[in-house]
Amino acid sequence: MDYQDTDECEPIHTSEGTWNVLLAHVNLKKKTKASQASGVYTLIEMVSKDVLAVIKKLDDAGFEVAIVGGAVRGLISGEKVSDWDLTTSARPEQILKLFPSSFYNNRFGTVGVKLTEKVVEITTYRKEQKYSDSRHPDIVVWGETLEEDLARRDFTTNAMALRFAQGKLSKISILNSQLSNFDLVDPYDGQKDLKAKLIRTVGDANQRFGEDALRLLRAVRIANDLGFEIEPSTRKAIGDNAVSIKKISGERIRDEIFKIIDSKNCDKGILLLRDVGLLAQILPELDVCFDVPQKSPKRHHVFDVGTHCVMSLANCPSKKTVVRFATLLHDIGKAKVASVTDEGVRTFYNHEVVGSRQVRDIAKRLSLSKTDREKLFRLVRWHQFSVDERQTDRALRRFIRNAELENVEDMMDLRVGDRLGGGLQQPESWRLKLFRQRLKEVLKKPFTVADLKVSGNDVMKILGISPGPKVGEVLKKLFEEVVDDNKKNNKEYLLKKIASFK
């Protein structure tokens, strides 16, 4: 849904008193039945009906409840909110009693309540505590007030809450949500930073990052997502504490990196990671590439290797995260093999081989799945494929076998990013277009083990063996012969070949 600010405003009750906040009311370009007469929507009218039902149930039971985090930021900014987080005075066991189908599998007071399509997370008020591992509090202590809970949060724009006046929800119809009795609680001037487009920590930045080192990455990711700047003292603290990101698990780091890679401003996000000193800690193999120039005679590249990798990512048409990641990393091997000839030409021989080994290490470090590890490896290892129009069908089949059939289109997307990220104007050369067409033609011919004129039964019968790995090994060898010479895919020849394995 598309929102825009309205020129009208009405009082909003906050913990500081009554403010006239323009952003508290938004004018929807796309009208719905509610408030269609005026076209003006209050914050409460933008809250999901399912979420309101959860809030009402907690309120009816006598508990304080508030919307917190990014949802409040989104509501104030007039954005569509899809992820809802609530905080409450109710303890986890009390929440579970109210919502029997909910789940609670952590020690940090967060209960997941299933809605129609999503899950709303409800967290009990908590107090600040010591974080020895830079990730989790040593002990969890329940708080008594919303203000205590907001004091422990990461950034000012996430430390705002939409608190509902207790006992005022009983008369509300969830189907026609009209409500003005709420407090926009903003003790750390989150609205001010939101308007100024700044990411700033709540309180002392070094303390906040010391409590949870993942916040270092989150600051960059949120700033990148929103198009915000990081406030100077917060930015300095990120650099000062960058090394502590290594205390965070590979899975958590991966998730934040992937969100940046998939974002609209992915290139700016990666460069921001480098500028604040985080890239050197999480992807040092890429960070060193910014010091490796490529411009030289007989080379089309105009960027250093690191900038080229980032620009390639920005121009990669694929929506697959692992393909975009491979595009970002495709040339990291160049930093290790860079050389200059006597004529001044820069060379990077076998960088794809070296780079493929590096991405195996990166994939392991970031706990990628086995499938993603293999795809990442193959895309980097074989990204230097030739599109020479004089190649034989046999050479094309070899390329497909090396890259693997399911990766062929992904390899094309990487090449498009590679070309545009190198300063070329066209996503595809005529040779690449011809290469694509020839691949399609080659793929129309028999190309899998299932296309062989013999089967596993033939192998077992001739060799007198039972089902097992040996059958697959023989079929694979036969397939490799047929790939190189399609004329050999006839039953008589293949049966004789099977017999030769006795």
Model-predicted regions and their roles:
Residues 2-3, 7-9, 15, 19-502:
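Catalytic cores of the polymerase beta-like nucleotidyltransferase superfamily
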